[in-house]
C-alpha cells in the first residue's frame, strides 16, 4: 500500500488532502518544522511526499533560497527515493486562454518567478521522481480557521466582500477554477498511477467571475457591478494530464460545489 507524507499541518491544501487521501492510502501529516528534524531514514517508507507549506516571503518577495521550503527540504537528501509532488502555480504563465505546458514561461509576479526557479531546481535534483503541478485557482474552505495565512484564497476574498455588505465593482474576467474535491481526486489518481512529469491542473474551461459569485451568493451578486474585461483572464489546458489519469471534471461540478459552500 502506498504511504503519503503531507508537509504543512494546517494549510488549506494539506488539511483537505489529508482527509481525502486517507480514504485510499496511509497518510501522515507534519509541519515543515517537524519534518526538518527527521532523519533521512524516516522518509524511506513513503512512496510520495507533498509539500503544502510556504513562506510568506516566497509569495511576496524576490527569490531567496532561504525562503524556498521545497529546496530546503530536499537538500536534506543525497538521493531521493520517493515521488515528490510539487505544488506549482499557473502564475508562471502570462494570462491568456488555453495555456499548455509547453507555452512560453512568463511569470506575472514574484510568486510566479519563484515557483519557476524552484521547478528548475527540482527537475535537476529529482529527475523522474518529480511531479510538478501548475495549478489554477482552487476553490474550497479552510479546515483550520483564524490562522496565519500566507496565501489568500478566492473564497477568503469572497467572504470578506460578503461581510462588508457594500456595493462593489469587479472586472468580469474569466478564470480557470477547480474545486478542492476535484483537485484532491486528481492527486489521488496521480499517486495511484505513479504519474510523473509536469502538468497543468485545471478545469480547462472559462468561468467568469460573475458566474461564480452568482453560484456562491445571488444576493451578493445583485450588489456587484461587473465590467467586461479580459486583462487577467486565463484558462489552462488540462488535456495532457487527463490523458494520463482518465477522469472527468466538469463545470457543473464546480457550480454544484459552490452552491454547497454557502448554506
Task: State where each predicted segment sits.
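NAD(P)H-binding glycine-rich loop region in Rossmannoid oxidoreductase-like domains
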Residues: 35-75, 90-92, 96
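N-terminal Rossmann NAD(P)H-binding glycine-rich loop of SDR-like oxidoreductase domains
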Residues: 2-23
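Mid/C-terminal beta-alpha module of Rossmann-like enzyme folds, strongest
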Residues: 184-232
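Active-site helix of classical SDR
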Residues: 110, 114
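NAD(P)-dependent short-chain dehydrogenase/reductase
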Residues: 120-174
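Conserved Rossmann-fold NAD(P)-dependent oxidoreductase catalytic core, especially the SDR/UDP-sugar
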Residues: 72-108, 131
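Alpha-helical substrate-binding/gating segment
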Residues: 155-168, 173-200
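Conserved C-terminal active-site "lid" loop/helix of NAD(P)H-dependent oxidoreductases
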Residues: 180, 208-214, 225-263
Amino acid at each position: 500500500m502506498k504511504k503519503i507524507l503531507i508537509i504543512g499541518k494546517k494549510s488549506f491544501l494539506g488539511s483537505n488532502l489529508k482527509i481525502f487521501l486517507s480514504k485510499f492510502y496511509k497518510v501522515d501529516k507534519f509541519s515543515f518544522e517537524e519534518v526538518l528534524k527527521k532523519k533521512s531514514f524516516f522518509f524511506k517508507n513513503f512512496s510520495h511526499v507533498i509539500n503544502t507549506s510556504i513562506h510568506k516571503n516566497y509569495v511576496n518577495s524576490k527569490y531567496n533560497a532561504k525562503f524556498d521550503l521545497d529546496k530546503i527540504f530536499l537538500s536534506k537528501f543525497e538521493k531521493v527515493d520517493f515521488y515528490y509532488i510539487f505544488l506549482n502555480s499557473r502564475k508562471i504563465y502570462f494570462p491568456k486562454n488555453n495555456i499548455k505546458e509547453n507555452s512560453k514561461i512568463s511569470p506575472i509576479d514574484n510568486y510566479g518567478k519563484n515557483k519557476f526557479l524552484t521547478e528548475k531546481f527540482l527537475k535537476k535534483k529529482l529527475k523522474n521522481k518529480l511531479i510538478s503541478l501548475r495549478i489554477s485557482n482552487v476553490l474550497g474552505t479552510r479546515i483550520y480557521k483564524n490562522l496565519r495565512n500566507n496565501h489568500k484564497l478566492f473564497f477568503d476574498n469572497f467572504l470578506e466582500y460578503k461581510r462588508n455588505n457594500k456595493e462593489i465593482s469587479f472586472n468580469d474576467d474569466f478564470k480557470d477554477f477547480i474545486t478542492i474535491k476535484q483537485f484532491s481526486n486528481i492527486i489521488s489518481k496521480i499517486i495511484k498511477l505513479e504519474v510523473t512529469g509536469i502538468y497543468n491542473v485545471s478545469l480547462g474551461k472559462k468561468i467568469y467571475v460573475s458566474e461564480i459569485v452568482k453560484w456562491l451568493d445571488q444576493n451578493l451578486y445583485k450588489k456587484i457591478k461587473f465590467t467586461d474585461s479580459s486583462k487577467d483572464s486565463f484558462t489552462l489546458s488540462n488535456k495532457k494530464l487527463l490523458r494520463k489519469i482518465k477522469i472527468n471534471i466538469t463545470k457543473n461540478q464546480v457550480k454544484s460545489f459552490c452552491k454547497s459552500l454557502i448554506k
